[in-house]
């Protein structure tokens, strides 16, 4: 952090609000590639990659601005030439975008540094850590009735991203360069290879587009910040990275124009005003839960669709928002199937000679392991077939038995660790069984034997560490408290380090 502040002169750039000259600084691209932290960036290094030099960057920008847009032709020779120019443009854009993504993050580095130095306290806007999502769902969802399952809309035009970023970065030259780069790349790839080029581009420039997408999501979440300030009872709990909006409150006069006058807005606010609204966002999905009725949630849905279409100038289909009743719907969120189950409870009461029954309905929040998506992921990784039957996984012949067992054991521990918050462990035990038997069959295949003959010849101690369940680990660690720990293990346990393996929530991890 000290080197970033030293070489980039962050305080000076912050006061001038002028980031464009930094694009021509060579050490920017060293920082963008995590270089230079172990040596002096300003010193000459003969082994340094010359493609990030000052002259190269200047030539790239000049060449992109002077590119002839009327080179598109139909014959084969010109098509090959166009493909050559397209590859050059992709290379140019990749180099500049890597440095630009680092530069536009400078205002946020400044804010973080000032916060660490105690100069300024960053407003949190009532944020929560991602670790609080599971306890929040467990504590609050059993008392709620309806939930809005919202898919966060994507901007349909690059100009929307540039306009949103304008409230964060006040340098017109940098924004103009970003607009030019995005438009030029989108137009060129649509003429050459739209699908393959855009896919490969998004993989190579994840940092820039992740920053632009987070800015878009922050603008989207500003709706709830605005409504919370209009109603002191509206509680907005965001579990995503919601940074502080800049100059947002200066746009209030424009926001209220949706309803006409300010008085009209205050008069219509009661339509979406409710003392117990909860908002959660994770990745590309968000939830808005309430105790209200179905009519109340429909009003919220209409309001959000109208606001997004007006404010973001994009068509937002109402079908991207689903209104679900928690008692009749299983919510797929963060790798779990969650619902609110009603447990009937009958109590017999007797007064003198008369007795009567009292029926109580107790709501309980359940979190289940989604067995079908997990089996599909295991089948994709060649651990089982599509029906969930374990199979042997082809491995390299040079891998030792301990390495194979360690790989299977690590996957099993990660899945067990992540889904330890499940209220029912049956599906989790099935996943463990698939991995354990697949490991045994893989080892037997390597030694050209059957599973039974392999275990009989080498002994079951080979898989003892891998087959050891978590309850056995608890018993060996604390034998005197085994009975109490058994009850703890069978209950829900939320681990605080699940963020490190949160790719399992998408069932897309490379097993």
UniProtKB/Swiss-Prot annotation:
Keywords: Chloroplast, mRNA processing, Plastid, RNA-binding, tRNA processing. GO terms for cellular component: chloroplast. InterPro entries: Domain_X, Maturase_MatK, Maturase_MatK_N. GO terms for biological process: mRNA processing; RNA splicing; tRNA processing. It is found in: Plastid, Chloroplast. One of its GO terms (molecular function) is RNA binding. It comes from the Eukaryota. Pfam families: Intron_maturas2, MatK_N. Usually encoded in the trnK tRNA gene intron. Probably assists in splicing its own and other chloroplast group II introns. Belongs to the intron maturase 2 family. MatK subfamily. This is Maturase K.
